[in-house]
Amino acid sequence: MAPPRTNNRPVTRRKKPSNLLLLLKEKYVNWNFIKYLAFEPAALPIVSVLIVLAEAVINVLVIQRVPYTEIDWKAYMQECEGFLNGTTNYSLLRGDTGPLVYPAAFVYIYSGLYYLTGQGTNVRLAQYIFACIYLLQMCLVLRLYTKSRKVPPYVLVLSAFTSYRIHSIYVLRLFNDPVAILLLYAALNLFLDQRWTLGSICYSLAVGVKMNILLFAPALLLFYLANLGVLRTLVQLTICAVLQLFIGAPFLRTHPMEYLRGSFDLGRIFEHKWTVNYRFLSKELFEQREFHLVLLALHLLLLLCFAKPTWTFFRSYLRLREVQQQIVPQILHKNREQQNQAKIQAKKSKQLVEQQQEEEDEQLSAEQKSFLKAFERSLQQSTGQKSLEPHLNQKQEQYDIYFEPCTQLALLPFFLCNFIGVACARSLHYQFYIWYFHSLPYLVWSTPYSLGVRYLILGIIEYCWNTYPSTMESSIALHLCHLILLVGVARHVYRILRLNATVKQQQRQEQSTLQNGQPKTSKKSQ
């Protein structure tokens, strides 16, 4: 009995995937690719996916294994229950921890959570909802870092995975700060995508959840003016204001003064026992109005000091975006032309090869042709490889310019403006850490300091926020880190301004030299 003719087929099928696995192993399982993932900001799209997946696992483990701590959740539910029962007087909406002090968007969002969690009793479900909020915010934050290509991926990995306080704030405390920060980062992403109206809506909603989002307002105003001009800026500010009136309407119609005093109380006194940054002050000095006015004056002074760099950065960002809008269509057109030319060339080459093949076939006898084909098939079966064919469609190099790093010019002023507000705050409570946590790596990498100093700043800040209760030493260390970080960013920013001024001066000198030289050359020619 003749042996079966299909003995070699399984061999060829096994070798194809093994070859593919070898190629993947050679390309990705090596030290160079690991270094690329760790240190190259261009690898952030890949690393971001890994971070989000790992964070999902970490949050589930924290929820399952670490006990929940009740602080404000019940009070939030009690305040919302009063609203749902028909009370629109803010002075009457209270919980176990005190009166309601947040704007109307907070009331609506937590009223939704009130229903979803069975009047606030299903805390475990609320924890998983806040875990989703955390993951969604991480996606928005990582998108900004991916666009800017400023910070190495390993820094974001370390900062995300090593902060117990941040995970605690989101899934073990259920504060309203995460909701406000989520809307804030959604607004920043929309602004950078030039979706101004949606960005303004998200920003206004964030302010409607918690008033600390106003710390970004000075930078946002300049960003509006630099990109939109005065009239369109007024339109966006009107959108923000109208949305605040709309969400506050049930309270403004009935008890307007109580709503404004309760939700936008700029003079509210914080309790000294919860302060993270001013433990070294006495309670009397901490609560003095003069001390608050000094901090406000310092805040405004620092904003004025950085107003010119902020405006310069925003204008430079706008100019680069305009260049992008001019160049990108040209690049796309050039690439399409190349592709069309490549297709035409490939078609001509294919016709030429077929013509040559026909000429060669005419010179061979039928017996020779069959012998060559049989020999080729036997080689394919023994090696598991296909016959080599001429590469008619070789991949053409395409033109491309990556413009997204220009978002560095927009992000730094936003993060810096918020950081100044946090550093000059009358008091910082533990949940306020998320106000600037996700921007700290960006700010630290915007300083001229060495890597060791950068790690030290991030490490000490994390230590200060994890010290409970706060001590004199931890509060002083936090202020020192804020000061060192602010000085470093200022050095970086003003160095860029000096370089910019030098380049402009050189350009003016070159232009004046050319203008002065033109009459002389014309006289010589005459």
Swiss-Prot record:
Record protein name field: Dolichyl-P-Man:Man5GlcNAc2-PP-dolichol alpha-1,3-mannosyltransferase Alg3
Organism: Drosophila virilis (Fruit fly)
Record keyword Endoplasmic reticulum present: yes
Lineage: Eukaryota, Metazoa, Ecdysozoa, Arthropoda, Hexapoda
Role noted for this protein: Probable alpha-1,3-mannosyltransferase involved in the N-glycosylation pathway. Involved in glycosylation of the TNF receptor grnd, regulating its ligand affinity. Required for normal epithelial growth and architecture. Suppressor of JNK-dependent intestinal stem cell proliferation.
GO biological process: negative regulation of tumor necrosis factor-mediated signaling pathway; protein glycosylation
PANTHER family in alphabetical order: DOL-P-MAN:MAN(5)GLCNAC(2)-PP-DOL ALPHA-1,3-MANNOSYLTRANSFERASE (PTHR12646:SF0), NOT56 - RELATED (PTHR12646)
Entry's localization field: Endoplasmic reticulum membrane
Ranges annotated as spanning the membrane: 43-63, 98-118, 125-145, 171-191, 211-231, 232-252, 294-314, 405-425, 432-452, 470-490
Key word Chaperone present: no
Gene expressing this chain: l(2)not
Main location: endoplasmic reticulum
Cysteine pairings via disulfide bonds: none
